[in-house]
Amino acid sequence: VQGLIINARQTCNFAAAENAVVFECVHRLLEKGYKPEHIELEPKWKLGHGASGGRADILVRDHQGQPLLIIECKTFEKEFEKAWRDTQQDGGQLFSYIEQEKATQFVCLYASAWNASTQRIDTQQKIISVKDNPKVLQDNPRLAAFANANNNKERFRVWKDTYQLEATETGLFEENILPYQIGKNKYALDMDTKTIQALDIKGAYHKFRTILRKHNVSRRENAFEVLVNLFLCKIVDELSNPNDLNFYWKGMAYDSYFDLVDRLQRLYKIGMERFLGQDIVYVSNEDIDGAFWAFKQKPNATEERIKELFRQLKFFKGLDFEFIKVSNQHYFEKNAKILLEMIQMWQGYRLTGSEQNQFLGDMFEYFLDNGIKQSEGQFFTPVPICKFVVSALPLEHLIAHNPEPIRALDYACGSGHFLTEYAQQIPALIRHIKQIDHPSEYYRAIYGIEKEDRLAKVAKVAAF
């Protein structure tokens, strides 16, 4: 390729499997729209006294010729995972390269391999932003900044302590990413999520429990309730913001814990009002700023102090997303890390759609059966019995002899096992008896009554 800068030719052949990854990565960069003269292969730097030097695979510069991105290529899975563990341990090769190109804004660990079964190239990437997020530093001035780091070890400590070893797996080669604009601050339902399948349930449940154990979360009942709240937020988000998802962690380069929780609170308020008819108190950051309109011309310490008090009341008390008890900023950040892992577990999946999806119902049934203690007066009917009872109903006769959709009512619905089982059987019956392909009218005739708020919420969310 004319204009491509080649400093050495160790990777300009296919003698090693890793070289094929470099070739494929360069092809992607060119295909994306990066100019050849901005792509440099095997830039070499001296790594220290007595060191033989270091050689990165790919250096990408911006339009001004400044270093923008350093890419280290590895073979798929095993070598990639090892390199990523090394990076998390002490910075690995990636952070040693930053020391030589201090103006670099991003570093990336990249791997690719041909998948014979799908006839496509699978990729792995970990993109680390090494530029500061002003919002994160503003929220907590005590945190160290990349701008003040003087060496490799200090930069790694900033990444570890301030940005929590944050890395993203998208933001370089996706269709809605422009060249030279690395990272994403906007995610869309159709491009950044995939339909969830029932086969994901076991792995998802295992990951959920692993996160709880990792952070010593012992209140499983409470954790399940928070999970239901998160699902409610995600459903609202998919229905209301398909082109700019709020239920998505954008990475420390573009997001902060406070902004994330604020978005969740807003989605939760909308969901509780729309689906459960409950008015939830929600004070947005904009509401807080608006309360001080009279002080805009004369900002002072009093305003900052009142804002801090607002923040403590808003974020540190009575959260609907508490996996652990939050009473101050330390525990808020600790809880936010758990919350973040839960969100990242689900953000890439799509829960809503035109086709019936039994995932939520199956998931909640499994969680209730395995992780929630039944308190006095609450008894959950086992799923096989629900299936048997619903199957014993004369549904075919009722559907055939009623011109209007038949109504179904469970006046003590609990978590909605009977209702979801009934809803699952309806489509096949109406298609066979009345040649109706869309069961929406029949779904609107399904009702449940439950006095316990938590279970009513579970039943409502499971119905999606």
Predicted regions and their residues:
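Active-site metal-binding core of divalent-cation-utilizing nuclease and nuclease-like domains
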Residues: 11-14, 37-65
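Conserved S-adenosyl-L-methionine
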Residues: 381-464
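Acidic-basic catalytic patches of nuclease active cores, encompassing PD-(D/E)XK
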Residues: 2-44
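Long recognition/docking surfaces used for binding and targeting
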Residues: 232, 239-369
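Conserved catalytic cores of phosphodiester-cleaving nucleases, focusing on short active-site segments
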Residues: 25, 56-62, 67-80, 97
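Active-site-adjacent loop/helix micro-motif of nuclease/hydrolase catalytic cores
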Residues: 37, 50-53, 67-70, 78-91
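Nucleic-acid nuclease catalytic cores
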Residues: 81-138, 142-145
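Non-catalytic accessory regions of SAM-dependent methyltransferases
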Residues: 163-249
